[in-house]
Regions:
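Short, Lys/Arg-enriched N-terminal segments with co-localized hydrophobic residues
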Residues: 13-26
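Short hydrophobic alpha-helical segments enriched in small aliphatic residues
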Residues: 7-12
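Conserved NTP/Mg2+-binding pocket subregion across the NTase superfamily
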Residues: 91-211, 310-312, 316-322
Length: 322
């Protein structure tokens, strides 16, 4: 039986204290949780191996009390686990949970429960486990798809050797010129939808366009700036949550100013801030990577926004742009 030491390189260096959470229950420590996870695996012959991924195996992720335990049990039969009512209670008393594969199955979406099944659980002591049971054949392939995977237990040496966990798969990727041009074009083009939405005072539509369609282009552009400055050796995290590590405080504050409340004029302010920021950084990225930025397109997009911003509510036509 193989059990890889994981204390030193998975969760060392944590200085925070455990806290009292829901219902006054004391939050179990990392040591207690890891022991529980491995004890359950060692005492169940159906579980042949355990591996972990996510923030706890990422050396660059911040360490705090909200980190999930992203655990995979490699099992002889997944069905035996998801048909056993209350099995998940071995890990503690759940506050509430989600079962992604069960939900997909209920909604008629294609899923293969014989390969993988999961429970995402927040327990009453505040700990969260994202646990999946994977079949042996599925696990052998799955573990190779994420360089953050780290083997905690392998009773039969069935899993492939995994090097030291790294977040390299999530590093900012160097763009080519087509990536850059398409990202820029979609940013400026989709802003015309925001302009007419603001003129019509369709706030839900505007918010959706800004945050679901346009903002990702700005985040991508900022990630390229960060990539250039770090030789594309870092990750900015999901939704750019780690950008503040790499951007100057002034630039990061300007990015935060692109968020707005629901008031129309405040939304316009955030849009123009977003445009100025995108235009500035796009020119910088283009210069650094030897690309050509379509400034004519950007200027035209800005002109359209400014005209619509100044357009009266009773206007019967859009002024000529000639």
């Amino acid at each position: 039986m193989y059990s890889k030491p994981f204390v030193n390189n998975v969760h060392s260096g944590l200085a925070f204290k455990q806290v009292l959470l829901i219902g006054g229950t004391i939050m179990r420590t990392q040591t207690e949780m890891y022991k529980l996870i491995l004890d359950i695996a060692n005492n169940d012959d159906r579980i042949r191996a355990v591996y972990m991924n996510g923030s706890r195996t990422n050396p660059n992720a911040p360490k705090d009390i909200f980190q999930d335990y992203d655990i995979v049990y490699v099992v002889t039969d997944t069905k035996a686990f998801y048909e056993e009512n209350g099995w998940i209670n071995k890990f503690g008393e759940p506050l509430y949970m989600q079962k992604p594969e069960m939900m997909d199955n209920l909604l008629g979406e294609e899923c293969h429960l014989e390969d993988t099944y999961g429970w995402l659980v927040i327990f009453k002591d505040g700990n969260r486990i994202d646990l999946h049971v994977n079949s042996i054949p599925y696990a052998k392939k799955d573990i190779l798809n994420d360089k953050l995977c780290q083997i905690l237990l392998d009773k039969d040496h069935i899993l492939p050797h995994m090097p030291e966990s790294t977040d390299i798969d999530y590093h900012v990727k160097r763009p080519n010129e087509n990536d850059f041009l398409c990202e820029s074009n979609d940013f400026w083009w989709c802003l015309n939808n925001v302009a007419k939405g603001l003129w019509r005072e369709e706030v839900p539509y505007v918010m959706d366009m800004l945050n679901s369609v346009i903002r990702p282009h700005l985040v991508t552009l900022l990630s390229w700036k960060i990539g250039i400055e770090t030789d594309f050796s870092c990750s900015i995290g999901k939704s750019g949550k780690y950008m503040n590590r790499y951007l100057s405080q002034g630039l990061y504050n300007r990015y935060l100013e692109t968020y707005s409340d629901y008031k129309i004029e405040n939304l316009w302010d955030s849009v123009f801030t977003m445009c100025d920021l995108f235009n500035e950084v796009a020119n910088e990225v283009a210069t650094s990577l030897g690309f050509t930025y379509n400034q004519i397109e950007a200027d035209a997009g800005m002109k359209f926004l400014q005209v619509v911003h100044n357009l009266s509510k009773d206007a019967l036509e859009i002024p000529s742009f000639i």
